[in-house]
Design a protein with these regions (language model features):
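ABC ATPase NBD coupling module
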Residues: 2-23
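Short coil-to-helix segment of the ABC ATPase nucleotide-binding domain corresponding to the Q-loop/switch region
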Residues: 35-44
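Conserved ABC ATPase signature
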Residues: 76-80, 84-86
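Hydrophobic anchor residue at the start of the ABC signature
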Residues: 90
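A short, proline-enriched helix->beta-strand linker immediately N-terminal to the Walker B motif
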Residues: 95-99
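Catalytic Walker B motif of ABC-type/P-loop ATPase nucleotide-binding domains
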Residues: 101-104
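Helix N-cap at the start of a conserved alpha-helix in ABC-type nucleotide-binding domains
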Residues: 112-114
Length: 152
């Protein structure tokens, strides 16, 4: 695998790279429904042992604020709408900003307004230097991309 101007050989190195530098955004959100918003985001943040618990709480609160879900930390994921769940998934990306984002139909089940929010967050990640790769059937999502690759 060749990433960021270096070759990554071997299962362990590739796995570590994916863990540390790749973020995923799925159509079905990939959240744990019977846990809180905080617990779901903290799972992604956990590999960062450098931050104290207080600093991590602050970082999670900031990420939730960025996606319009300030104060949702204690809410159960199963109680949230689809748009809110997708924004939790984006907040999960924001606490450990990835170098690469792989998004599979990230707006597939969302209404227009929530789709626009998700697109804006993906655009912000791209503008911040991340490589964002999106698989989509949505013209709205495709229209916000810098480059297109059609697969038939």
């Amino acid at each position: 695998m060749f990433v960021t101007f270096r070759t990554i050989l071997g299962y362990r190195k590739a796995r570590k790279y994916r863990r540390d530098y790749v973020g995923y955004l799925f159509q079905d959100y990939a959240l744990i429904p019977d846990q809180t918003v905080y617990e779901n985001i903290n799972l992604a943040a956990r590999p960062n042992k450098i931050l104290s618990t207080k600093a991590m709480l602050t970082q999670i609160a900031q990420a939730l604020d960025q996606v319009g879900l300030a104060g949702y930390e204690r809410r159960q994921v199963c109680e949230l709408s689809g748009g809110e769940q997708q924004r939790v998934a984006i907040a999960r990306l924001l606490v450990r900003p990835p170098k690469v984002v792989l998004a599979d139909e990230p707006t597939g089940v969302l209404d227009h307004d929530n789709s626009l929010r998700v697109i804006a967050h993906l655009r912000d990640l791209a503008d911040g230097g991340a490589s964002v790769v999106v698989a989509t059937h949505s013209d709205l999502v495709a229209g916000s991309a810098d480059q297109h690759i059609k697969v038939a």
